[in-house]
Amino acid sequence: MGFMELAKERYTVRKYADKPLEKEQLDKLLECLLIAPTAKNLQPVRVIEGEKNLAKLDELTKCRYGAPCVLAFTYNKDEDWKNSIESGFHSGEQDVSIVATHIMLRAQELGLGTTWINWYAPVAFERAFDIPVNESSVLLMCVGYAADDAHPARMHSETRPLDEMVRYL
């Protein structure tokens, strides 16, 4: 399967099968941490696997949809790249997004579904899960097997025309 086909087939899963995620599958996903590009290859991204604390996580977001595993993506604020030209600009959130996208697409390749979650309170999550103060939570990602009746959202395949999204300089 080519990249474009893989990317088009991927969708946000909102209903997961009652089937555990095998450690081998999780390990294959986490290998993406080693190959995804990050600014200056500093690799400040951390992933916390949350299979054991799903009930605690359910108190912080309604977006788990029965997934057997949730990955939490953080970055180490002491290790991300800082832009010396513009203060306050650093790479942590971008690095996390790149790694998370790699994991999301690898999951699709492996026959797994994912849900990218931004609908949670990062500070409350950091407190509830004792995230070190030098790490910042960026997103959560559900991972598991999609239920047989799971399907893409109604607007999944709708896109704006390309000329509305591209500006040539």
Predicted feature locations:
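Acidic, surface-exposed loops and disordered segments
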Residues: 1-169
